Amino acid sequence: MKQLTILGSTGSIGTSTLAVVRANPQLFAVKALVAGRNVELMTGQCLEFRPAYAAMSDKRAAEELRLRLKDLNVATEVLSGEQAACDLAALDDVDQVMAAIVGAAGLLPTLAAIRAGKKVLLANKESLVTCGRLFLEAVSASKAQLLPIDSEHNAIFQSLPASLQQQLGYASLENNGIESIILTGSGGPFRDTPLVELPHMTPDQACAHPNWSMGRKISVDSATMMNKGLEYIEARWLFNATDAQMEVILHPQSVIHSMVRYRDGSVIAQLGSPDMRTPIAHAMAWPQRVESGVQPLDFTRMSAMTFAQPDYTRYPCLKLAMDASKAGQAATTTLNAANEIAVAAFLASEIRFTDIAALNVAVLDTLSCQEPQNVDAVIAIDREARAAAQALLPRFAAKRASVI
């Protein structure tokens, strides 16, 4: 029986992880749950899975959860704050940690799990985007095991030789006969929207992904293809890939989740239904396989699979991320922080959809940071970039108001 801590249990990855636990109660047990403010959902999760601990980032939410669980006679100990999340990620009797807190907020708890030598199921791509080299050094020093959860990175992982799977972040692709890694992306809901209409797209339209069911922030990132850009950065770190060893292509059907191109002309792809329970179940059970609850892919019901090159005019955020990856860790940290502010402002209807990329560019142009040498420096860059983005927001909000 594997004991599990879930960081971000009330989000889409967290609930999918619990669905896999539910499908395999003889294999997995929940030791601890960590979430933000969703007391209603966390109460239900504690009632069903009876974890020893639950932590909320918000102190008031934790107090409300504590009262609700007491009324329900649930013995789960309730904690609050960032340190509690870090402590639960490093519990002695926890075997694996699902790192699924969205954004830079997930960095320190994920690092705590790494430093404790846990098997870390990495869904928080920002850990590598903001802290790639330092993160992988911590993995190496602690002998922790890293398994990717993002459908694309999990697909790549499954398409790699076993020797490479054991050496994430350090093995040579070239020495293993690999020419390139091919990241696929659907292109989001605005793939065919006329460019002149993009400024007028609403948050609800941006969150209506054609294939995947996701949270609102990642749905907007999919619409801008910033999500693919962050995955590009993450893939370079995870698989020790150069810019020349990376390809990004559009695949609207989201059936092929990513591919690996080999020197002999072979291309190995991982296919499946667009359901995050598949990569989650794979990582939780690796190197074995378990039931995920996902409907099998029915090839007889599939339409043709199509592919195309991404248009950077339509997806400037993708190009921004690729360029930031070449510039270094300070640039990727700055971009990630600016984007989180920009997406939150768009979801609050404060700026237009196309202002997300424009605000990201403005913050990158404003800041000039030295490469971080430790986690504190990364956090400082993140904080500075967020402040710069907040300071620039009124300019874009005024522009939106003048258009309405």
Swiss-Prot record:
A Pfam match: DXPR_C
GO biological process entries: isopentenyl diphosphate biosynthetic process, methylerythritol 4-phosphate pathway involved in terpenoid biosynthetic process
Enzyme Commission designation: 1.1.1.267
Residues that, per the record, bind Mn(2+): 150, 152, 231
Source superkingdom: Bacteria
Reactions mediated catalytically: 2-C-methyl-D-erythritol 4-phosphate + NADP(+) = 1-deoxy-D-xylulose 5-phosphate + NADPH + H(+)
Necessary cofactors: Mg(2+); Mn(2+)
Pathway per the UniProt entry: Isoprenoid biosynthesis; isopentenyl diphosphate biosynthesis via DXP pathway; isopentenyl diphosphate from 1-deoxy-D-xylulose 5-phosphate: step 1/6
Family annotation (Gene3D superfamilies): 1.10.1740.10, NAD(P)-binding Rossmann-like Domain
Positions with a binding annotation for 1-deoxy-D-xylulose 5-phosphate: 125, 151-152, 186, 209, 222, 227-228, 231
Keywords from the named record: Isoprene biosynthesis, Manganese, Metal-binding, NADP, Oxidoreductase
Subunit structure: Homodimer.
NCBIfam families with a match to the protein in the record: Dxr (TIGR00243), PRK05447.1-1 (NF003938), PRK12464.1 (NF009114)
Task performed by this protein: Catalyzes the NADPH-dependent rearrangement and reduction of 1-deoxy-D-xylulose-5-phosphate (DXP) to 2-C-methyl-D-erythritol 4-phosphate (MEP).
Stated name of the protein: 1-deoxy-D-xylulose 5-phosphate reductoisomerase
Phylogenetic placement of the source organism: Bacteria, Pseudomonadati, Pseudomonadota, Gammaproteobacteria, Enterobacterales
UniProt gene name: dxr
